[in-house]
Protein backbone atom coordinates (compact mmCIF):
# COMPACT_ATOMS: atom_id res chain seq x y z
CA UNK A 1 0.00 0.00 0.00
CA UNK A 2 1.33 3.41 -0.98
CA UNK A 3 -0.12 6.32 1.01
CA UNK A 4 -2.06 8.76 -1.19
CA UNK A 5 0.25 11.68 -0.38
CA UNK A 6 3.31 9.73 -1.54
CA UNK A 7 1.51 8.28 -4.58
CA UNK A 8 0.53 11.82 -5.62
CA UNK A 9 4.15 13.03 -5.22
CA UNK A 10 5.47 10.11 -7.30
CA UNK A 11 2.82 10.64 -9.98
CA UNK A 12 3.60 14.37 -10.06
CA UNK A 13 7.31 13.66 -10.49
CA UNK A 14 6.62 11.30 -13.44
CA UNK A 15 4.39 13.83 -15.22
CA UNK A 16 6.04 14.87 -18.47
CA UNK A 17 8.86 12.31 -18.06
CA UNK A 18 7.02 9.16 -19.05
CA UNK A 19 5.47 8.46 -22.46
CA UNK A 20 2.92 5.64 -22.29
CA UNK A 21 1.53 4.10 -25.45
CA UNK A 22 -1.12 1.46 -24.89
CA UNK A 23 -1.71 -0.30 -28.18
CA UNK A 24 -4.99 -1.76 -26.87
CA UNK A 25 -6.41 1.76 -26.51
CA UNK A 26 -4.92 3.02 -29.76
CA UNK A 27 -6.00 -0.12 -31.61
CA UNK A 28 -2.62 -0.44 -33.27
CA UNK A 29 -1.03 -3.65 -32.06
CA UNK A 30 0.58 -4.67 -35.32
CA UNK A 31 4.37 -4.77 -35.50
CA UNK A 32 4.68 -1.89 -38.01
CA UNK A 33 2.59 0.44 -35.83
CA UNK A 34 4.61 -0.42 -32.72
CA UNK A 35 7.92 0.31 -34.46
CA UNK A 36 6.48 3.54 -35.97
CA UNK A 37 5.32 4.79 -32.57
CA UNK A 38 8.74 3.97 -31.07
CA UNK A 39 10.48 5.93 -33.85
CA UNK A 40 8.12 8.86 -33.26
CA UNK A 41 8.81 8.74 -29.50
CA UNK A 42 12.57 8.95 -30.15
CA UNK A 43 12.21 11.92 -32.51
CA UNK A 44 9.47 13.85 -30.70
CA UNK A 45 10.15 13.16 -27.02
CA UNK A 46 13.74 11.92 -26.92
CA UNK A 47 12.68 8.61 -25.39
CA UNK A 48 15.62 6.28 -24.85
CA UNK A 49 14.09 3.37 -22.89
CA UNK A 50 11.21 1.31 -24.25
CA UNK A 51 9.15 -1.49 -22.75
CA UNK A 52 7.16 -4.03 -24.74
CA UNK A 53 4.99 -5.90 -22.28
CA UNK A 54 4.48 -9.29 -23.83
CA UNK A 55 4.39 -10.34 -27.48
CA UNK A 56 1.21 -12.40 -27.12
CA UNK A 57 -1.27 -9.60 -27.98
CA UNK A 58 0.86 -8.25 -30.85
CA UNK A 59 -0.43 -8.83 -34.37
CA UNK A 60 2.24 -9.96 -36.78
CA UNK A 61 2.03 -9.57 -40.54
CA UNK A 62 1.78 -12.81 -42.53
CA UNK A 63 1.14 -14.79 -39.37
CA UNK A 64 -0.49 -18.16 -39.25
CA UNK A 65 -0.55 -20.41 -36.20
CA UNK A 66 2.39 -22.46 -37.47
CA UNK A 67 4.45 -19.31 -38.14
CA UNK A 68 3.83 -17.64 -34.76
CA UNK A 69 7.33 -18.35 -33.40
CA UNK A 70 8.92 -17.26 -36.68
CA UNK A 71 6.92 -14.01 -36.49
CA UNK A 72 8.04 -13.46 -32.87
CA UNK A 73 11.64 -14.01 -33.96
CA UNK A 74 11.33 -11.55 -36.83
CA UNK A 75 9.74 -8.88 -34.62
CA UNK A 76 12.39 -9.38 -31.93
CA UNK A 77 14.98 -8.82 -34.65
CA UNK A 78 13.23 -5.61 -35.67
CA UNK A 79 13.30 -4.41 -32.04
CA UNK A 80 17.06 -5.13 -31.88
CA UNK A 81 17.63 -3.20 -35.13
CA UNK A 82 15.53 -0.29 -33.83
CA UNK A 83 17.51 -0.20 -30.57
CA UNK A 84 20.90 -0.23 -32.28
CA UNK A 85 19.93 2.28 -34.97
CA UNK A 86 18.56 4.77 -32.43
CA UNK A 87 21.02 4.00 -29.59
CA UNK A 88 18.17 3.20 -27.20
CA UNK A 89 17.32 0.27 -24.95
CA UNK A 90 14.27 -1.95 -25.44
CA UNK A 91 12.98 -4.17 -22.64
CA UNK A 92 10.81 -7.04 -23.82
CA UNK A 93 8.70 -8.79 -21.20
CA UNK A 94 8.55 -12.53 -21.91
CA UNK A 95 6.76 -14.76 -19.46
CA UNK A 96 8.11 -18.17 -18.43
CA UNK A 97 6.95 -21.32 -20.15
CA UNK A 98 4.26 -23.24 -18.34
CA UNK A 99 5.16 -26.54 -16.74
CA UNK A 100 8.31 -27.32 -14.79
CA UNK A 101 8.51 -23.84 -13.22
CA UNK A 102 6.33 -24.97 -10.32
CA UNK A 103 9.30 -26.86 -8.90
CA UNK A 104 11.34 -24.72 -6.49
CA UNK A 105 14.10 -23.66 -8.88
CA UNK A 106 15.30 -20.36 -10.23
CA UNK A 107 14.30 -19.60 -13.80
CA UNK A 108 16.90 -19.88 -16.54
CA UNK A 109 17.08 -18.38 -20.03
CA UNK A 110 15.65 -21.66 -21.35
CA UNK A 111 12.45 -21.06 -19.35
CA UNK A 112 11.55 -17.92 -21.33
CA UNK A 113 8.37 -18.53 -23.31
CA UNK A 114 8.01 -17.92 -27.01
CA UNK A 115 10.57 -18.23 -29.77
CA UNK A 116 14.12 -19.18 -28.75
CA UNK A 117 15.33 -16.17 -30.75
CA UNK A 118 13.86 -13.87 -28.11
CA UNK A 119 16.71 -14.90 -25.82
CA UNK A 120 19.26 -15.45 -28.60
CA UNK A 121 18.85 -11.95 -30.04
CA UNK A 122 18.67 -10.14 -26.72
CA UNK A 123 21.75 -8.43 -25.29
CA UNK A 124 20.50 -9.02 -21.76
CA UNK A 125 17.96 -11.33 -20.18
CA UNK A 126 16.82 -11.33 -16.59
CA UNK A 127 14.04 -12.75 -14.48
CA UNK A 128 12.16 -11.17 -11.61
CA UNK A 129 10.48 -13.70 -9.34
CA UNK A 130 8.31 -12.98 -6.33
CA UNK A 131 8.84 -15.10 -3.25
CA UNK A 132 5.90 -17.04 -1.92
CA UNK A 133 4.27 -15.34 1.07
CA UNK A 134 5.24 -18.18 3.41
CA UNK A 135 8.94 -17.85 2.47
CA UNK A 136 9.37 -14.08 2.83
CA UNK A 137 9.86 -14.10 6.61
CA UNK A 138 12.28 -17.05 6.47
CA UNK A 139 14.48 -15.61 3.72
CA UNK A 140 14.12 -11.91 4.52
CA UNK A 141 13.42 -10.74 0.98
CA UNK A 142 10.38 -10.43 -1.31
CA UNK A 143 11.80 -11.13 -4.75
CA UNK A 144 14.82 -12.32 -6.65
CA UNK A 145 16.35 -10.69 -9.70
CA UNK A 146 18.44 -13.10 -11.76
CA UNK A 147 20.68 -11.85 -14.55
CA UNK A 148 20.38 -14.72 -17.04
CA UNK A 149 22.35 -13.25 -19.94
CA UNK A 150 24.75 -10.32 -20.07
CA UNK A 151 26.30 -9.85 -23.50
CA UNK A 152 28.32 -6.78 -22.46
CA UNK A 153 30.20 -8.26 -19.50
CA UNK A 154 29.32 -11.95 -19.51
CA UNK A 155 28.65 -12.09 -15.77
CA UNK A 156 25.42 -13.37 -14.28
CA UNK A 157 24.10 -13.03 -10.73
CA UNK A 158 21.16 -13.56 -8.40
CA UNK A 159 20.16 -10.51 -6.36
CA UNK A 160 17.82 -10.55 -3.36
CA UNK A 161 15.34 -7.65 -3.36
CA UNK A 162 13.03 -6.11 -0.77
CA UNK A 163 9.94 -4.23 -1.96
CA UNK A 164 8.88 -1.07 -0.12
CA UNK A 165 5.23 -0.52 -1.03
CA UNK A 166 5.33 2.87 0.67
CA UNK A 167 7.51 4.29 -2.10
CA UNK A 168 6.94 1.69 -4.86
CA UNK A 169 10.59 0.70 -4.93
CA UNK A 170 12.70 -2.47 -4.85
CA UNK A 171 16.05 -2.23 -3.09
CA UNK A 172 18.82 -4.75 -2.72
CA UNK A 173 18.48 -6.69 0.54
CA UNK A 174 20.53 -4.98 3.24
CA UNK A 175 20.88 -1.64 1.45
CA UNK A 176 19.18 1.39 2.87
CA UNK A 177 16.75 3.46 0.88
CA UNK A 178 18.16 6.43 -0.97
CA UNK A 179 16.57 9.78 -1.69
CA UNK A 180 14.59 9.55 -4.92
CA UNK A 181 13.75 12.30 -7.38
CA UNK A 182 10.15 12.53 -6.22
CA UNK A 183 11.37 13.18 -2.64
CA UNK A 184 13.36 16.30 -3.51
Task: Describe every region a protein language model picked out.
Residues 1-45, 158-160:
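Cytosolic-facing regulatory segments adjacent to core modules
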Residues 2-12, 113-114, 133-134, 146-150:
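Intrinsically disordered, low-complexity boundary segments flanking structured domains
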Residues 2-3, 97, 108, 135, ...:
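Alpha-helix initiation/capping motif
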Residues 8-11, 102, 108, 151, ...:
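Homeobox/homeodomain signature
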Residues 15-16, 172, 184:
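Intrinsic disorder/low-complexity segments enriched in polar/charged and small flexible residues
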Residues 23-145, 179-183:
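P-loop NTPase motor core
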Residues 133-181:
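P-loop/Walker A phosphate-binding loop and immediately adjacent motor/lid segment at beta-alpha junctions
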